[in-house]
Amino acid sequence: MDEPSNMSTTSSKIPQYDFYSDVDNLHPDQFRIQCLPGRNFISPLVEQKKDFVKAHVIHDKDLDIMYDPMPKGKCNISQSCLTLPLACPRVSLHFDPSKTTVAMVTCGGVCPGLNDVIRGITLAAVCSYHVKKVIGFKYGYWGLSKAGRHTAIELTSNIVRGLRHLGGTFLGTSRGGQNISDMVDTLVEYGVNILFTIGGDGTQKGAVAISEEVNRRGLDIAVFGIPKTIDNDLSFSQRTFGYETAVSEAVIAIRAAHAEAISHEYGVGIVKLMGRNSGFIAASATVASALSHICLIPEKNVSKKVLLSLIEARFMMAKDIVIVVAEGFGQDWPDCNEDLGSDASGNKRLTDIGLVIKKIVQDHLSKNPKYHQSTVKYIDPSYMIRACPASTSDAAFCSNLSTLAVHEAMAGRTACLITLWYSNFVLVPIKTAVSHRKIVSTGGALWRQVREVTVDGSGDIAMVHQQELSRELKAINAHRNSIMEQLSKL
């Protein structure tokens, strides 16, 4: 049997790291947040919510949390000296709310929660800070270009209140970059003081470029990122918005594949899920559903030979199997070596690994008369998952994320984004956040859970099958004895 390696090869040049592992060469300076000079205005929240000030919910203190509280080596406690600044409402502001224009843009693929973030930013800016104006630029960074700047719309509380129940993005989106100088010209033309960039790593790299051009011109504009990655692969982030919704919707697809599989003799259900470089959705949905028997992710290379042996192992114990595969898995297989080019964001187009696996399984089963009634069903729910509204949990998460982003941006924080880290909302410089990619640790807790609910081909398959039959026989005997005992009392 071929032994799978611990890590797959990806096309990305971005360094990758396991969630709870150290990132090499981290330095405290990499977590230092830029702030526009001067805080000369008192927040209206001080007057509105005096009890919050007394309770120190609103303050000007710079509070940090430990970057890594996990113990390492022989020590029983963490030795990490790195910290991340906590996000909170501030007493002193850099921007005068009455003269502040807030703008936002959504970029890249759609994701559950985008409209909740648009809504949260608008309501916090309008209702809490009473800013001069909130502007939405349409269709991603194109809306900031010369060609698209005329499509900008003003956002009000009445316009955004109903967005909670809608999928997609109210502002529209697009991929690909635009001329940085033109985009900054648009910000100047509209008198924008704060720009929120809602998108993935490509979007946030664009935000860094905008911030640098703003600095070069000496403009008083804050550029603040709100990370969007349904794959949950953002570094220095425990969870990204849309991820929990995606896992919940993925479980529905897995249940459908399971229903198909158990309805046929030697039925096979295949579900392809999002996960270009990181398999968090596939792994979490596998654990949550407890109906998947094989989980394939980019972080864990598995050969075709090993895959087929795992299928045979399952078929020795049952007559159905569900395979969950992340879209980035198997791209180094010979079947996936066709060059499909890149999309507008520069991402390599992937071969549909779900279709590849379907054909491999069909060919394998067709060679064995035992499987003459087998069937293989393939489900790709990706776009349905991306386009649905956020779950209740994700919607609340988006509200917290966007509200705190407004608080910190009003205080002059710039070139940073907001993330959740060990149940706390923290600020991370954009450059640091996009310098690494988070991946599933195949030696960590999540992958351990996956291994516990899926087929394990590492042992003696015949012995495992015998033990399973023995357990079932004991259960049947116990049930029979119970019935006999009840009959004897009649």
Swiss-Prot record:
> What residues bind Mg(2+), as annotated?
201
Gene name, please?
pfk
Report residues binding ATP.
Answer: 109, 175-176, 200-203
Active site (catalytic residues): 231 (proton acceptor)
Q: Where is this site: Important for substrate specificity?
A: 202
Predominant subcellular localization, coarse grouping: other
**Which Pfam families does the record cross-reference, listed alphabetically?**
PFK
> Where in the cell?
Glycosome
Motif Peroxisomal targeting signal is found at 488-490
Regulation of activity: what does the record state?
Answer: Allosterically activated by AMP.
The UniProt entry, under InterPro entries, shows: ATP_PFK, PFKA, Phosphofructokinase_dom, PKF_sf, PyroP-dep_PFK_TP0108
The record describes its quaternary structure and partners as:
Homotetramer.
- The protein's superkingdom reads Eukaryota
Q: Name one GO molecular function term.
A: ATP binding
Q: Which cofactor does it need?
A: Mg(2+)
EC number(s) on file: 2.7.1.11
Instruction: List the NCBIfam families.
Output: PRK06830.1
**Where do the annotations place substrate binding?**
229-231, 274-276, 327, 383-386
| UniProt KW keywords | Allosteric enzyme, ATP-binding, Glycolysis, Glycosome, Kinase, Magnesium, Metal-binding, Nucleotide-binding, Peroxisome, Transferase
Instruction: Briefly state the protein's biological role.
Output: Catalyzes the phosphorylation of D-fructose 6-phosphate to fructose 1,6-bisphosphate by ATP, the first committing step of glycolysis.
GO CC, sorted alphabetically, is: glycosome
**Protein family membership:** Belongs to the phosphofructokinase type A (PFKA) family. PPi-dependent PFK group II subfamily. Atypical ATP-dependent clade 'X' sub-subfamily.
> What is the protein's given name?
ATP-dependent 6-phosphofructokinase
- List the residue ranges forming a coiled coil, or say none: none
Tell me which PANTHER family the record gives.
ATP-DEPENDENT 6-PHOSPHOFRUCTOKINASE 1
